[in-house]
């Protein structure tokens, strides 16, 4: 339901806690933005993905018995994702929160299911095309940035659709419609065809040579080894399924490598991962403090934004605004957004580091790696960024299902700095531009970004 960074949630559960609460939540609820409608009956919820012309059932889920202060109801999908609902000011307004998200979603009571849901959109080439094209029209955030006339794209491709269009032809049509975006947070997946389509921003794919899976298995360790051999003093200590790594460059400089913001715990879902992260940070920052710290997210594939906020809290000396998140709120007007949902960085009372920091970034700093970088921008003293622009994808992925069972996703949110700046498409720029893992440097075992970081910290 709604969106979740680099994972798709297709079943949503909202239910009531106990008897008087059940009656207060029973009924139909529509999200502000996100294109979701929820039908609550007792302890069961049915979810629908809705556009102006289509309706696709999204699944069902059940209430779970978790009574936590501030929550009116807690619920769980069949996949194990946890959501909760809380009061929103009136009996016809609530707030829904996905535990892996840094923001909330407003839901409002409506009299009944939309008329378009009386008959779910059929699994035909025409029906699948309508769901795909309308969802993009109503939710994608970057048509103007990508200089795309979506209505024209739809008109051109609709003529290719007939009742006899094959699944392979349909996939190729959909892929061709969104290929020019070169947006890492867009994808199509067809398990029956064993096909999936996703892309990186042009010019940033140079680090990934060939298959993405092969790069993660062999390419990533090879690139990380360049830094380890040239600069790291002794073996790195590892936590959170090796996603958090820490060591020293020298007696004065700590080195924190964050490979992702997900997969921190094999059990316990998001909460289990947060517990594992906090324990790792306790261990790291309970050591004698170095004079300076290098944070390396040059290879970071994203995950859950709140984990990044938790790390930022260990580095903050005072409270500040990390970012404000908005989502497209109108199916026609691209300039209408949901009310801003601010995320604050509040200094943690647990062990941390308040001294000088340099952050290493690059084109494979992706998604939650970028929101983490954005969350560090307001920190005092300033964290100097060294490397290349990040990938330029910040929104959670709005996951959707087609009537034929295929999945697709797109970004529908914008993360804004306190002055309203967003970095979609271009990424966050470094303060000091240095090539990241250039072929010649990798071949010779050099890491010029790390060299520049140490030079800078030596003068702090």
List the model feature ranges, each with a label.
Residues 21-328, 335, 399-401, 456-459:
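Flexible, low-complexity junctional segments that flank or bridge functional domains
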Residues 424, 428-460:
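Low-complexity, Gly/Ser/Thr/Pro-rich intrinsically disordered linker/tail segments
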Residues 356-378, 383-391:
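Extended C-terminal subregions enriched in glycine
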Residues 257-261, 296-300, 326-328, 360-364, ...:
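Active-site-proximal beta-strand/loop segments in catalytic clefts of secreted hydrolases
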Residues 11-19:
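Hydrophobic h-region of N-terminal signal peptides that target proteins for export
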Residues 302-360, 398-402, 412-416, 422-423:
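Gly/Ser/Thr-rich loop/hinge elements
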Residues 367, 386-403, 408-410, 426-432:
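C-terminal soluble interaction/assembly domains
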Residues 1-8:
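Bacterial N-terminal signal peptides that target proteins for export
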């Amino acid at each position: 339901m709604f969106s979740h960074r680099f994972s798709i949630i297709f079943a949503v559960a909202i239910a009531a806690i106990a008897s008087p609460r059940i009656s207060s939540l029973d009924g139909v609820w529509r999200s502000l933005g996100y294109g979701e409608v929820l039908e609550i009956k007792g302890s069961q919820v049915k979810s629908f993905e809705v556009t102006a012309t289509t309706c696709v059932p999204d699944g069902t889920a059940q209430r779970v018995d978790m009574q936590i202060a501030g929550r009116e109801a807690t619920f769980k999908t069949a996949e194990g994702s946890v959501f909760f609902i809380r009061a929103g000011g009136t009996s016809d307004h609530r707030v829904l929160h996905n535990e892996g998200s840094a923001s909330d979603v407003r839901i409002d009571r409506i009299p009944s299911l939309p008329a378009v849901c009386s008959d779910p959109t059929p699994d035909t080439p025409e029906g699948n095309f309508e769901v795909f094209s309308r969802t993009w029209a109503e939710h994608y955030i970057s048509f103007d940035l990508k200089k795309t006339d979506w209505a024209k794209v739809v008109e051109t491709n609709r003529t290719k659709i007939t009742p006899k269009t094959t699944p392979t032809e349909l996939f190729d049509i959909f892929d061709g419609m969104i290929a020019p975006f070169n947006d890492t947070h867009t994808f199509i997946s067809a398990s029956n065809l064993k096909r999936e389509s996703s892309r990186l921003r042009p010019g940033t794919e140079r680090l990934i040579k060939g298959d993405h899976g092969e790069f993660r298995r062999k390419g990533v360790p090879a690139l990380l080894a360049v830094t380890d051999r040239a600069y790291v003093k002794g073996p790195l200590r590892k936590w959170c399924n090796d996603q958090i790594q820490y060591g020293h460059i020298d007696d004065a400089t700590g080195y924190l490598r964050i490979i992702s913001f997900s997969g921190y715990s094999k059990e316990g879902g998001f909460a289990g991962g947060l517990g594992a992260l906090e324990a790792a940070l306790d261990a790291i920052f309970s050591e004698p403090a170095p004079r300076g710290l290098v944070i390396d997210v040059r290879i970071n594939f994203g995950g859950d934004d709140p984990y990044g906020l938790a790390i930022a809290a260990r580095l903050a000396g005072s409270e500040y605004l990390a970012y404000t998140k908005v989502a497209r709120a109108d199916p026609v007007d691209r300039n209408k957004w949901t009310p801003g949902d601010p995320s604050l960085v509040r200094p943690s009372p647990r062990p941390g580091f308040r001294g000088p920091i340099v952050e290493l970034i690059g084109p494979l700093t992706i998604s939650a790696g970028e929101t983490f970088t954005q969350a560090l921008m307001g920190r005092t003293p300033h964290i100097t960024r060294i490397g290349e622009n990040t990938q330029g994808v910040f929104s959670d992925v709005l996951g959707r299902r087609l009537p034929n069972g295929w999945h697709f996703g797109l970004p529908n949110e914008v993360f804004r700095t306190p002055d309203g700046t967003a970095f979609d498409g271009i990424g966050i720029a470094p303060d000091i531009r240095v090539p990241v893992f250039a072929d010649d440097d990798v071949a010779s075992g050099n890491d010029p970004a790390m060299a520049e970081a140490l030079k800078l910290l030596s003068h702090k």
